[in-house]
Amino acid sequence: PIINFKKKVIYSSIMLSRDELPNNIKLSSSNRTQVHLHPECFSDSVALFITRSLRFFADTFFKKRYGHRAVVLETVAAVPGMVGGMLAHFKSLRKMIDDGDFIKELLEEADNERMHLMTFIAIAKPSTFERFIIMAGQFVFGAFYTLLYIFFKRTAHRMVGYFEEEAVFSYTEYLYEIDSGKIPNTPAPEIAINYWGLDKNATLREVIEVIRDDEAGHRDRNHAIADSI
């Protein structure tokens, strides 16, 4: 239910009931995986504003094309862990202190998001234009997030927490579209079956479920890291 992670408290929304949630965490009535941490300071509000702004553009551009939206969003989501891990690595070298498993954790998060991207590339088969958007997004967001992390580390982790809140919401919508028959529940791509150890007859719905679980974990972890700073 409540997991202590290196003196950080992680709230696992899938495990907790509504009454067990802390005051600043609100649970959606429609889905128990929908958790939102309300901003408690200016830094949190800035992080949420950036997230909601990016969400608006994603919704406007992709609308119900969830697979294509995921391709672009996952290429952005793979950046923070790598940037944070790299900067934490250099900090450890500079100060000559062991940073525990923090560096490894951030790099594992980045690699997990990278596998999300590889999976959705296999599912959505992005066009040449969308591949260009991916490369441009990596460059622009990578530069932005690096500067944000250097000067406002807490805001950076809080923003990623909010990113992941939106990711969980987006993948929940994706599941609703599959369940309603609007999106075909096609066989899972081989890369997803191998990475998550799914059954060989697994479907797209099972892939979206495990990816959503990953995002919920990243959400909780980054909010907890922000709380500790």
PLM-predicted stretches and their roles:
Residues 5, 9-229:
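Non-heme di-metal
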